Amino acid sequence: MVHCAGCKRPILDRFLLNVLDRAWHVKCVQCCECKCNLTEKCFSREGKLYCKNDFFRCFGTKCAGCAQGISPSDLVRRARSKVFHLNCFTCMMCNKQLSTGEELYIIDENKFVCKEDYLSNSSVAKENSLHSATTGSDPSLSPDSQDPSQDDAKDSESANVSDKEGGSNENDDQNLGAKRRGPRTTIKAKQLETLKAAFAATPKPTRHIREQLAQETGLNMRVIQVWFQNRRSKERRMKQLSALGARRHAFFRSPRRMRPLVDRLEPGELIPNGPFSFYGDYQSEYYGPGGNYDFFPQGPPSSQAQTPVDLPFVPSSGPSGTPLGGLDHPLPGHHPSSEAQRFTDILAHPPGDSPSPEPSLPGPLHSMSAEVFGPSPPFSSLSVNGGASYGNHLSHPPEMNEAAVW
């Protein structure tokens, strides 16, 4: 015996209906809401049968205005993600039914104000704010009230408009004459991506571009304008912080470690007690204390160093056995004298057993040394403690080269 799925009684009729793979009496297949018989088409939810209208009314899209279901045959209007009946899609101030493509302002996601009422209320609020003693509020919220050329001048004033729109009501009594701010606007991720892409292309968009963005994102033009102003202000702050950070990095960066001076010197440089000091090889009475200025009765020149270690380095042009090589050019402004001739006579005829590789010095050196030394003592009184090869005639020229350094 077959039982009905609706009334649970056995089916004794000649005809039966098969719905949801179950057997039904013909009279039991009816809408659970309006009790109308369902002969051609039916809808089911949780084991219950519905007609088309009741099913969409109960489980279909709800109208954001009246919170009632929307029938498939009803005409609707869509604003952002909300769907409205035609009769519910009206201005909250003048109750005018809004048409498709008409500019409007959305409040609390489900209330609308037409453009005419919004602009008229904004102008009234502007006049009240001009006559009010309280200052500091934005002059106007109209998208046409400001030109993009004036945006930068008012970036700092309107940078916090979107952040302060949902503020507390503590100052309402003090700002009765001032314009009231609208609700806080929440920008969704897709809308934010569109605004960022537009900002990357044009940081300061024109009114026409803002109108296009308003149509694409569904945001009103004032919100878009304030967003661009805040974005430009943020970019300027980030550039200032990055420039300040670069200057701080350049100022506080770690200094280079100083390398030892000896490692960078050439082998011929004169460093006291250094690895290549020539004075360590010629420890004689000539370099003893007070012996540096035997040829200078008046003392050393004031501009020269006081010790041999302070002498500048003179590259050697002679053989490697001499501490300092000979100079090939005289100092400018010096001329030969009678004392220079004495040097020439002595140095031009060295002894035959002299080991010096330089039998004579060039003439320009003698003219320079005569001017530098002044009156010269006899060469017979000079002796070098370096060995027997350095005779009384001063066949080796290191002393002459030493004097030439001064």
Swiss-Prot record:
Complex and partners: Interacts with LDB1 via the tandem LIM domains.
DNA-binding residue intervals: 180-239
Alphabetic keyword roster: Developmental protein, Differentiation, DNA-binding, Homeobox, LIM domain, Metal-binding, Neurogenesis, Nucleus, Phosphoprotein, Repeat, Transcription, Transcription regulation, Zinc
Superkingdom: Eukaryota
Expressed in which tissues: Expressed in epithelial structures of the embryonic metanephric kidneys including the ureteric bud and its derivatives, and coma-shaped and S-shaped bodies differentiating from the metanephric mesenchyme. In the adult brain, expressed in the adrenal medulla, Purkinje cells of the cerebellum, hypothalamus, midbrain and pons. Also expressed in the adult testis.
Main location: nucleus
Gene Ontology molecular function: cis-regulatory region sequence-specific DNA binding; DNA-binding transcription factor activity; DNA-binding transcription factor activity, RNA polymerase II-specific; RNA polymerase II transcription regulatory region sequence-specific DNA binding; sequence-specific double-stranded DNA binding; zinc ion binding
Modified residues (Phosphoserine): 162
Disulphide-bonded residues: none
One GO term (biological process): regulation of gene expression
One GO CC annotation: nucleus
Function comment: Potential transcription factor. May play a role in early mesoderm formation and later in lateral mesoderm differentiation and neurogenesis.
Location of the protein in the cell: Nucleus
Annotated ranges, domain LIM zinc-binding: 4-54, 63-117
This protein's name: LIM/homeobox protein Lhx1
